[in-house]
């Protein structure tokens, strides 16, 4: 994990991990506990982060595609950071707002989905094409 390497080099690093859900907050907490390091680290749900100002050395945004709505993009204003790491498996958005990510947190590395599946980082999945009639869209507006 990137955090363990950073902590060995910079043990005083102040880290803020931002997640979209409480489930992910719990998962991160468990993973950090498993590292066995004492970290100067907070894990917060995005709704909490955008309500106040923060100053950290490292900002980690898990599921960064979730932070690109107008409201949640405020994380880039509310948090003062030296380094930022965004994590996602689905960066591109139909509304084009993934361009915000390129401004604040440009892609520096990616892993092909085949490698992720082989290593057990993602589960097997199926893609389905679901055709809908334009009239159906109007029904649900």
What are these regions (language model features)?
Residues 41-75:
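Conserved RecA-like ASCE ATPase "motif II neighborhood" in helicase/translocase motors
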Residues 65-125:
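Post-DEXD/H (motif II) to motif III coupling segment of the RecA-like Helicase ATP-binding lobe
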């Amino acid at each position: 994990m990137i955090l363990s390497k950073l902590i060995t080099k910079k043990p005083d690093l102040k880290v803020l991990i931002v997640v979209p859900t409480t489930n992910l907050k719990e998962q991160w907490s468990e993973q950090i506990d498993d590292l066995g390091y004492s970290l100067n680290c907070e894990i917060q749900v995005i709704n909490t982060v955008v309500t106040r100002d923060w100053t950290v050395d490292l900002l980690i945004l898990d599921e960064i595609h979730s932070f690109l709505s107008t409201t949640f993009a405020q994380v880039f204003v509310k948090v003062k950071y030296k380094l930022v790491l965004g994590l996602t498996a689905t960066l591109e958005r139909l509304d084009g707002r993934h361009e915000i990510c390129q401004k604040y947190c440009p892609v520096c590395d990616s892993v092909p989905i085949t490698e992720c599946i082989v290593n057990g980082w993602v589960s097997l999945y199926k893609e389905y094409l679901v055709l809908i009639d334009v009239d159906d869209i109007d029904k649900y507006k």
